[in-house]
Swiss-Prot record:
SUPFAM superfamilies: SIS domain. This is Phosphoheptose isomerase. The reaction produces a racemic mixture of D-glycero-alpha-D-manno-heptose 7-phosphate and D-glycero-beta-D-manno-heptose 7-phosphate. Binds 1 zinc ion per subunit. Pfam families: SIS_2. The lineage of its organism: Bacteria, Pseudomonadati, Pseudomonadota, Gammaproteobacteria, Pseudomonadales. Belongs to the SIS family. GmhA subfamily. It comes from Pseudomonas putida (strain GB-1).
Length: 197
């Protein structure tokens, strides 16, 4: 297969996954946005975590809220738990890598805050511990997962929201996660500041 055919095949696979996900995920993304807006209206904040590409997604989400998405508006409180190398490495060194997010949540999380927990497999041990810590702090969890939802799905409470991408391919799951994050940012802005359409 020549390179351009391979590129087209990858584009088509991404399109197909997004089309399949659109109807399945729309109600879950809507519900997640309502949870997040309710938290923000009640002086709550967003905390976000994940590993690797999912860490990048956590940072992307937090930066879109803190700075801006597609319009000028006041900053919204959001913290990516993936960015402080001193904190991450001290926890990993002194305790365990599995606790790098949960210890931060126990310090920063408050009742009514929301945790955006991101894992393509749903089985990242440190994200699973983050969910447990969030529940201990009476936070609501929005989980971005893929495959069968993994261990994260089994931990979710009725008030939590899972956005599970219908794919087993990591790259396709990550692509839909980013789109879901952009949808969340758009819905948060439109609910808090009015629709621009």
């Amino acid at each position: 297969m020549d390179m351009q055919s391979r590129i087209r095949r990858l584009f088509q696979a991404s399109i197909d996954t997004k089309q399949q996900a659109m109807d399945i995920l729309a109600p879950h993304i809507e519900q997640a946005s309502l949870v997040m807006v309710n938290a923000l209206l009640n002086e709550g904040k967003m905390l976000a975590c994940g590993n690797g590409g999912s860490a990048g997604d956590a940072q992307h989400f937090s930066s879109e809220l803190l700075n801006r998405f597609e319009r000028e508006r006041p900053s919204l409180p959001a913290i990516a738990l993936t960015t402080d190398s001193s904190t991450l490495t001290s926890i990993a060194n002194d305790y365990s890598y599995n606790e790098v997010f949960s210890k931060q949540i126990r310090a920063l999380g408050q009742p009514g805050d929301v945790l955006l927990a991101i894992s393509t497999s749903g089985n990242s041990a440190n994200v699973i511990q983050a969910i447990q810590a969030a529940h201990d702090r009476e936070m609501i969890v929005v989980a971005l997962t893929g495959r069968d939802g993994g261990g994260m799905a089994s931990l979710l409470l009725p008030e939590d929201v899972e956005i599970r991408v219908p794919s087993t391919v990591t790259a396709r799951i990550q692509e839909v996660h980013l789109l879901a994050i952009h949808c969340l940012c758009d819905l948060i802005d439109s609910q808090l500041f009015g629709s621009e359409e």
